[in-house]
């Protein structure tokens, strides 16, 4: 059936394939010849439909359910369905989906935070785990710093930036500290990053600890901010897989979760999706072929998002192979159009710029004075730390 032309009989068989796949996606149950005849309302006999089923089974498009005797589409059938039907939906999206898409962020300078919110809304609309890739946006600045004591000599430092990024590090304290002392240091550093007068008077020891923590975490931040070999990846909504019947099996759930949490896999799929101007589905065995791994028994659908005509990254959703592809493709297309409009306005209004990963860039270095060229974040000068 791979020829450029097909006979009338082959056309009928492929119609049966598409109809069987459509019915399976709607019901989630194996499709029998009688059920299909009632659904499509044709004058084909059940015996003829069973013969077509047998041919499609031999071609690898269907497999038989040994309990009911009905047929279940294979990954190959879902691929054929996606290629021929997924972009053809005339159905209106559910009102709940439209309402969520209308909540997408408007223009703002908090690019990363807005993209994260958009990802959450997309996940709610589709009830699927979502992820997205993002370049690095230039001239970001630290707007908040928080400290949390792990024990007497370790603290978690959290940096928040103007563009909505959050960085965390666990750092060793040069001297033992307590929660009250660390809180005073936190308030002092928050005043510093906000260019306000200090609200706390610190002892010399506390000031030394604070400046050491700040400079250490800023150097780490600048290093990560400027030296990166792949787009940033954000993921959310893994628990949504539990609502799907196929993922109630612990082994299937483990396969899906391990695939979604594999950063290398998701970055590669989003990179492929970013360079296509439409939704792209990767289904079951196709994922296995790309990564030379066992079949993860799931599907990933990606769509690029743009600033004007420039692709910035891609959003992706993950779910079982029997996804409602038509609804997802339509939702993703509307979603991407709204994101494009918002990002384009934001970039021009706030004069934003961004960088792609470039591991071979000779200007990238761990030397703080070179790193700082890409950001407005600065180290404290020596006189302020003495």
UniProtKB/Swiss-Prot annotation:
The keyword Disulfide bond does not apply. One of its GO terms (biological process) is negative regulation of DNA-templated transcription. The keyword Lipid biosynthesis does not apply. Transmembrane segments: none annotated. Disulfide bonds: none annotated. HAMAP family: HrcA (MF_00081). Belongs to the HrcA family. This is Heat-inducible transcription repressor HrcA. The lineage of its organism: Bacteria, Pseudomonadati, Chlamydiota, Chlamydiia, Chlamydiales.
């Amino acid at each position: 059936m791979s020829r450029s032309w097909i006979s009338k009989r082959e056309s009928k068989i492929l119609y049966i394939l598409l109809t069987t796949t459509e019915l399976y996606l709607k019901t989630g149950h194996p499709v029998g010849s009688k059920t299909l005849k009632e659904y499509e309302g044709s004058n084909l006999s059940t015996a003829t439909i069973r013969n077509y089923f047998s041919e499609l089974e031999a071609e690898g498009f269907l497999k038989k359910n040994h309990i009911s005797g009905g047929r279940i589409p294979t990954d190959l059938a879902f691929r054929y369905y996606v290629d021929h039907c997924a972009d053809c939906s005339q159905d209106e999206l559910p009102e709940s989906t439209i309402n969520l898409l209308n909540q997408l962020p408007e223009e703002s300078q908090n690019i990363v935070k807005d993209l994260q919110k958009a990802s959450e809304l997309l996940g709610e609309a589709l009830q699927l785990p979502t992820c997205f890739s993002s370049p690095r946006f230039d001239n970001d600045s630290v707007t908040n710093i928080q400290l949390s004591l792990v024990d007497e000599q370790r603290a978690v430092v959290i940096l928040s930036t103007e563009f909505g990024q959050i960085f965390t590090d666990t750092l060793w304290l040069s001297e033992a500290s307590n929660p009250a002392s660390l809180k005073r240091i936190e308030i002092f550093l928050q005043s510093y990053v906000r260019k306000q007068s200090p609200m706390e008077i610190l002892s010399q020891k506390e000031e030394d600890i604070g400046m050491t923590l700040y400079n250490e975490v800023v150097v780490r931040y600048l290093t990560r901010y400027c030296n990166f070999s792949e787009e940033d990846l954000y993921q959310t909504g893994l628990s949504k897989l539990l609502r799907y019947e196929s993922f109630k099996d612990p082994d299937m759930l483990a396969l899906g979760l391990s695939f979604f949490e594999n950063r290398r896999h998701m970055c590669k799929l989003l990179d492929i999706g970013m360079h296509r101007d439409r939704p792209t589905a990767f289904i079951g065995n196709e994922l296995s072929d790309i990564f030379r791994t066992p079949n993860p028994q799931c599907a990933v659908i990606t769509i690029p998002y743009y600033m004007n005509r420039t692709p910035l990254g891609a959003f992706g959703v993950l779910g079982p192979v029997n996804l409602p592809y038509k609804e997802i493709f339509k939702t993703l297309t509307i979603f991407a159009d709204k994101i494009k409009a918002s990002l384009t306005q934001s970039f021009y209004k706030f004069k934003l710029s961004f960088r792609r990963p470039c591991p071979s860039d000779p200007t990238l270095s761990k030397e703080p004075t070179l790193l700082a060229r890409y950001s407005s974040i600065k180290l404290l000068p020596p006189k302020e730390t003495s």
